[in-house]
Amino acid sequence: MILYDAIMYKYPNAVSRKDFELRNDGNGSYIEKWNLRAPLPTQAELETWWEELQKNPPYEPPDQVELLAQELSQEKLARKQLEELNKTLGNELSDIKLSLLSLKGDYAE
């Protein structure tokens, strides 16, 4: 158990060295000073908070490389869709031009 993380899970606004101080003399970490307006937590409470923290880890933002990879993938997809749309519109424009030319040819006679 990481004592600091367990305390911060229960008291997220607590400030280390102001609201509490931890110490380790070689026999494990313990709370040396407790200045929060709450009872000093028992070992059982600390372990419960630690277990809850393990079940519900705090949100970690995605890695910048992952974000860039997602953006690149979305841009590639959008580009492919635009290229297909451009091709379709180009084909339709060609058909319209041919229709106009054939209509002009009909009137020229």
Curated annotation (Swiss-Prot):
Signal peptide: none annotated. It holds the Pfam family XkdW. To B.subtilis YqcC. This is Phage-like element PBSX protein XkdW. It comes from Bacillus subtilis (strain 168). The lineage of its organism: Bacteria, Bacillati, Bacillota, Bacilli, Bacillales. The gene is xkdW.
